[in-house]
Structures are given as C-alpha cells and as structure tokens.
Amino acid sequence: MSAPTILIMAGGTGGHIMPGLAVAEVLRERGWRVLWLGNPDKMEGRLVPPRGIELVPLRFQGVRGRGAAALLKLPFLLARACAQAWRRLADIRPDVVLGMGGYVAFPGGVMAALRRTPLVVHEQNAVAGTANRWLARLARRVLSGFPGVLPRGEALGNPVRADLCALPEPAERYAGRSGALRVLVVGGSLGAHALNTTVPQALALLPEQARPQVVHQAGEQHLPALQQAYAQAGVQADCRAFIDDMAGAMAQADLLICRAGAMTVSEVAAAGVAALFVPFPHAIDDHQTANARFLSDAQAAWLQPQASLTPQWLAQWLGQRTRQELQAVAGRARTHALPRAAAHIADVCEQAARRAS
C-alpha cells in the first residue's frame, strides 16, 4: 500500500513557509509523502528542498501594490497558473491539499477544489491574507493561528519550535534574578531600523545605574550601524547579526522588544516572555497590529505603534518596568500558548483525507 500524499502550498515569506515545514515534518514522521507547491524563484525555493521535500514548481506572485500595469496582467497570469496547478494536481493526485498562505496557494487551492481534492486552509495572521480569504470559501476545513479570523475557522494556533515550548515556566525562570533588567531586542533576520535607532537613544536617556542589560539582534547588514549607534549613545550592548539559539535568548530575557509577525507573537506565548510589540506599520492590512492585540488585549504583552515610539517615550516606559511585573505578564502570555499546533493541523489533514476516501 502506497503512502498517503499531501501537497502543501505556501510561499513568499517565512511566516507562511516555516509553519508549513513544521506540519510537513509531523506528517513525514507519520509515514506521509510530502510535496510542496511553490515558486522556485522565491523564498520557498531556498528553504524547502534542503529539508528533503520535493518542490513542485508554480510560478505565480501577487500584484497587490505593483501598479495598474501589473493589475492588467493578472487575469492572464492567474489563468496560466491555474492551468499549471491543474496539471500538477493531476500528476500528483494528492490525498489532501494544505494551503498555508501566500499568492502561490490561490491557484493551487482553487484547482484542488475543482478536482474535489480535500482542501485545508491555515491562516497564520489575525487578519486573513487575500489568498486565504478566497480559499476559505472552498475549503473542507478552515484553521487559524488566532481566534475569529475566518468564518468556520478553528483556532488551532501556529506551529512553533519545540525548544520554545519546552522552556521552564516564567515563574521558575524569573525566580532568583536580581540586578539590571535583561532586555532582548529582535528586529528579525533583516533587522528593524526603527528599533535599531530608537532603543540606543532611549537607553542613553536613562541614568547609567537604571539601564537594562541589552542583547540586540540587528540583521547582518545593519550590525555596523547598530554598533555605532550604541557607541555614539555611550551605551553598552551585546549587538549581534543573528541569534542562533533564540529559545535560550528568550529564556534569559526579562523583556523582549520586537515586531509582531504571526510567528513572533506565537513564539512569545510559547516561550512565556514579556514583550513590547512594535508592529511593522506597512504590513498589508496592518495585520501585525491585529496579531499583537491577541496578547496585549489580554494584558499579556504591550503594544506601541511605531509612529509614537520615541526615545523619550521608551526611556520613560522602561524606567517604570519591574521584574515582578514582567514575570506576571510573561505568565499570562504562556497561558495563551498552543504548543501542539503542528500536530493538530496534521490531524485535521489526516481526517480530511480519510473522509474523502
């Protein structure tokens, strides 16, 4: 008897791809054959094949924000992508198709529905993307990382790394700490210019004895400028291009200052760490603000728009924080974690395949 087959569709950004890879790993451990529909010229082309997963090529990308000329080409590009997707599905004949977001998922999902192949959709963000908003109408099951995102949606959470979920409870980690607060600043792999400029200036406004210990991840191309910014501010900080052991860094931190991508918010909850979210202001549909509110509305994190993140505000805000308060916020964040999201999404895919057989 041949192994059951799933076709995962996700592309464009790590926020779509990494959760899909987590589900893929669970299903492979259960004996499934996993293939991936994606654009080989985009990020999935770099991330998926090294994991031993075959990338089934489909070259399609969105036109939102690309101008009128690109919009005029959309019907032709979409028709071509749908024809390609139909052929790929006919060749593969998957038992179930999982759409994790990104424009490449749209033609594949539509063609899967037309072929009556079970379609499962998972939306990571608190505001659904364009592709998933449409595909949710065609899907057998609709899943999400946060509650209330899509009609018929089941909030199963976002898959996060096991090492974050395995961290001790915040009360255990924070116990016995003394001295300066430990602050971890993370701008993502490419860094975040607003954090790289504002945090050093804010710390310079604090009395030296009141300054926290800072580990600041900036992205490789921004590291020299960040080091210069701290030097000019007269502030000591551990500046890094990347942090290989993010779980360890979060475990040591009293406070995390970061963006609010879906995976970041889910990782904050999984780790149980106090966080100040500064959403990227140009995210489509301002979805990072909605992501951050999942925790901030529950007093399990703080949310500060970038437009009002001034050095003066941040210095005053940091000066008011205590380790006891941060521990309480971290504990509330941990209560919102859904550590078995990848396994639960895999369960749904298996159920959809069985019901169709």
UniProtKB/Swiss-Prot annotation:
<dbReference type="InterPro" id="IPR006009">
    <property type="entry name" value="GlcNAc_MurG"/>
</dbReference>
<feature type="binding site">
    <location>
        <position position="161"/>
    </location>
    <ligand>
        <name>UDP-N-acetyl-alpha-D-glucosamine</name>
    </ligand>
</feature>
<keyword id="KW-0961">Cell wall biogenesis/degradation</keyword>
<dbReference type="GO" id="GO:0071555">
    <property type="term" value="P:cell wall organization"/>
</dbReference>
<dbReference type="GO" id="GO:0050511">
    <property type="term" value="F:undecaprenyldiphospho-muramoylpentapeptide beta-N-acetylglucosaminyltransferase activity"/>
</dbReference>
<comment type="similarity">
    <text>Belongs to the glycosyltransferase 28 family. MurG subfamily.</text>
</comment>
<dbReference type="GO" id="GO:0005975">
    <property type="term" value="P:carbohydrate metabolic process"/>
</dbReference>
<feature type="binding site">
    <location>
        <position position="288"/>
    </location>
    <ligand>
        <name>UDP-N-acetyl-alpha-D-glucosamine</name>
    </ligand>
</feature>
<dbReference type="Pfam" id="PF04101">
    <property type="entry name" value="Glyco_tran_28_C"/>
</dbReference>
<dbReference type="GO" id="GO:0051991">
    <property type="term" value="F:UDP-N-acetyl-D-glucosamine:N-acetylmuramoyl-L-alanyl-D-glutamyl-meso-2,6-diaminopimelyl-D-alanyl-D-alanine-diphosphoundecaprenol 4-beta-N-acetylglucosaminlytransferase activity"/>
</dbReference>
<keyword id="KW-0573">Peptidoglycan synthesis</keyword>
<feature type="binding site">
    <location>
        <position position="125"/>
    </location>
    <ligand>
        <name>UDP-N-acetyl-alpha-D-glucosamine</name>
    </ligand>
</feature>
<dbReference type="GO" id="GO:0009252">
    <property type="term" value="P:peptidoglycan biosynthetic process"/>
</dbReference>
<keyword id="KW-0472">Membrane</keyword>
<dbReference type="GO" id="GO:0051301">
    <property type="term" value="P:cell division"/>
</dbReference>
<keyword id="KW-0328">Glycosyltransferase</keyword>
<keyword id="KW-1003">Cell membrane</keyword>
<dbReference type="GO" id="GO:0030259">
    <property type="term" value="P:lipid glycosylation"/>
</dbReference>
<dbReference type="InterPro" id="IPR004276">
    <property type="entry name" value="GlycoTrans_28_N"/>
</dbReference>
<keyword id="KW-0132">Cell division</keyword>
<keyword id="KW-0133">Cell shape</keyword>
<keyword id="KW-0131">Cell cycle</keyword>
<feature type="binding site">
    <location>
        <position position="243"/>
    </location>
    <ligand>
        <name>UDP-N-acetyl-alpha-D-glucosamine</name>
    </ligand>
</feature>
<comment type="function">
    <text>Cell wall formation. Catalyzes the transfer of a GlcNAc subunit on undecaprenyl-pyrophosphoryl-MurNAc-pentapeptide (lipid intermediate I) to form undecaprenyl-pyrophosphoryl-MurNAc-(pentapeptide)GlcNAc (lipid intermediate II).</text>
</comment>
<dbReference type="GO" id="GO:0008360">
    <property type="term" value="P:regulation of cell shape"/>
</dbReference>
<feature type="binding site">
    <location>
        <position position="189"/>
    </location>
    <ligand>
        <name>UDP-N-acetyl-alpha-D-glucosamine</name>
    </ligand>
</feature>
<keyword id="KW-0997">Cell inner membrane</keyword>
<protein>
    <recommendedName>
        <fullName>UDP-N-acetylglucosamine--N-acetylmuramyl-(pentapeptide) pyrophosphoryl-undecaprenol N-acetylglucosamine transferase</fullName>
        <ecNumber>2.4.1.227</ecNumber>
    </recommendedName>
</protein>
<keyword id="KW-0808">Transferase</keyword>
<feature type="binding site">
    <location>
        <begin position="13"/>
        <end position="15"/>
    </location>
    <ligand>
        <name>UDP-N-acetyl-alpha-D-glucosamine</name>
    </ligand>
</feature>
<dbReference type="InterPro" id="IPR007235">
    <property type="entry name" value="Glyco_trans_28_C"/>
</dbReference>
<dbReference type="GO" id="GO:0005886">
    <property type="term" value="C:plasma membrane"/>
</dbReference>
<dbReference type="Pfam" id="PF03033">
    <property type="entry name" value="Glyco_transf_28"/>
</dbReference>
<comment type="pathway">
    <text>Cell wall biogenesis; peptidoglycan biosynthesis.</text>
</comment>
